[in-house]
């Protein structure tokens, strides 16, 4: 399983501080972006992140950022990400199913690879009604109510991995939300495991970072 630090910060300065702290251990990150409307919590915006990287003259082109867009206007955010892509490698763009992105938009060529995010209320069985899942490169399953780090893990959401596999989905499956040393055993005990784990406060708010990284990389 790939481990991705999920970076959810309130401003550009806090964001770059986290990247500098964690880039000693990781090359790929998941950047949480919330507009304060799709969720109540507003994070550092992409323009702020870009400005902070420029201001601090960070040389991080070797790092890859996936973007988890907790926003209504994902098209506008993707235009901002295009500008940021001059400074970092951009991996996956993760768009919430609730914002109703079309399959054509997800699969069209825009230099980035886009996938779906399933919220707590989203049902896997509804996906084939709108999407050819063979063409969706990644699906991220939320295991918490979105917007804040440190909210309770919902183990029942792990059943969605089974549901996707039973539908014949063969592309990447990520989990995000409430993942730590208490909940990881629940994930590892499943018949099907995810391809990636977005790790938030367990990494970003942890005082024993070296020990935590060692544990995560041993999975």
Predicted ranges, named:
Residues 6-10, 28-42, 61-105, 112-125, ...:
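Catalytic beta/alpha-barrel core
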Residues 15-22, 73-85, 121-133, 179-197:
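Catalytic cores of alpha/beta
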Residues 15-20, 47-55, 78-82, 103-106, ...:
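Generic structural signal for well-ordered alpha-helices
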Residues 1-4:
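Extreme N-terminal starter segment of soluble prokaryotic enzymes
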Residues 45-67, 115-119, 157-173, 177, ...:
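Alpha-helix-loop-beta-strand connector modules within alpha/beta enzyme cores
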Residues 97-99, 140-149, 190-216:
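Glycine-rich phosphate-binding active-site loops on the catalytic face of alpha/beta enzymes
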Residues 140, 145, 152-190:
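Active-site/ligand-binding-proximal alpha/beta "capping" segment
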Residues 37-74, 78-80, 184-204:
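A short alpha/beta connector and helix-capping loop motif
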């Amino acid at each position: 399983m790939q481990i991705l630090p999920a970076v959810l910060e309130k401003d550009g300065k806090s964001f770059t501080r986290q990247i500098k702290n964690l880039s000693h251990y990781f090359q790929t990150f998941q950047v949480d972006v919330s507009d304060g409307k799709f969720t109540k919590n507003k994070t550092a915006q992409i323009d702020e992140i870009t400005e902070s990287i420029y201001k601090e003259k960070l040389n991080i082109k070797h790092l890859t950022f996936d973007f988890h867009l907790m926003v209504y206007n994902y098209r506008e955010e993707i235009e901002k990400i295009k500008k940021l892509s001059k400074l970092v490698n951009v991996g996956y763009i993760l768009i919430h199913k609730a914002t109703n992105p079309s399959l054509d938009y997800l699969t069209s060529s825009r230099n980035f690879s886009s996938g779906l995010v399933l919220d707590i209320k989203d049902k896997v069985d509804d996906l084939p009604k709108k999407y050819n899942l063979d063409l969706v490169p990644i699906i991220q399953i939320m295991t918490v109510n979105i917007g804040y780090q440190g909210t309770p893990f919902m183990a029942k959401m792990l059943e969605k991995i089974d549901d996707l596999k039973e539908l014949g989905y063969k592309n990447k499956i990520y989990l995000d939300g409430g993942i730590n040393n208490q909940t990881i055993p629940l994930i590892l005990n499943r018949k099907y495991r995810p391809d990636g784990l977005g790790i938030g406060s367990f990494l970003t708010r942890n005082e024993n970072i070296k020990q935590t990284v060692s544990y995560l990389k041993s999975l």
